[in-house]
Amino acid sequence: MINYVAYRKFVTLQNGKRVMFRFLNDQDREELIRLFQDAPEEDLRFLKQNVKDIKLVNSWVDNINYQRVLPLLAINLEANNIIADATLHRGKHAAKHIGEVRIFVSRPFRNLGVGSLMLEEMINLAKKEGLHWLKAEIIADHKKVVKAFRTRGFEARATLEDYFIRKDGVTHDIILMLRPVVKREEAEF
């Protein structure tokens, strides 16, 4: 079992900056709002929710439930600010053994490995939480992201044509990627 309050992991990015991973808590409200408010619209158009909606972000902080959604933050230790957010959304009922991974990295910290490191940590956390599968829905045009997931054991299981629609009405194909967390023979019910 993970101690959600005490959990900390320290990593070094490709540029040498030190970053701490920890879970979202009620003290992170303003920083989380800032992370998304500062992001250009272009960076947010492929997210499933309107993260510019302050009420939505407030609801995440007000209703933290680590058994439902595991929100992992990346904190830049130099500036003490949130630079990335990764969430592990747990399935319910017949899908309770499946977690969906979503990752957002602020533009200044992209291509430095923070997203990949957070993905690796999501895999480790899924193992500790007893999940059997991880899934991700990735925009097909985002080749680097698809490659990063593939490198970490995810397989493309389906391409869903025109599955994602942006606010402006433009549709995009989604690649559904899955990764087993435990081998089938290790799984217990």
Describe the function of each predicted region.
Residues D162-F189:
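C-terminal "cap" of GNAT-fold acetyltransferases
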Residues R110, A136-V146:
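Conserved beta-strand-loop-alpha-helix junction that forms the acyl-donor binding cleft
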Residues K17-V19, A79-D85, H172:
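Glycine-rich phosphate/pyrophosphate-binding loop shared by adenosine-nucleotide-utilizing enzymes
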Residues Q49-R107, P180-V182:
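Acetyl-CoA-dependent GNAT
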Residues R29, R34-K48:
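Helix-loop element at the rim of GNAT/NAT acetyltransferase active sites that forms part
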Residues V105, N111-K128, K147-T151:
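Conserved acetyl-CoA-binding loop-helix of GNAT-fold acetyltransferases
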Residues E137-I138, R150-H172:
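Conserved catalytic-core motifs of GNAT/GCN5-like acyltransferases
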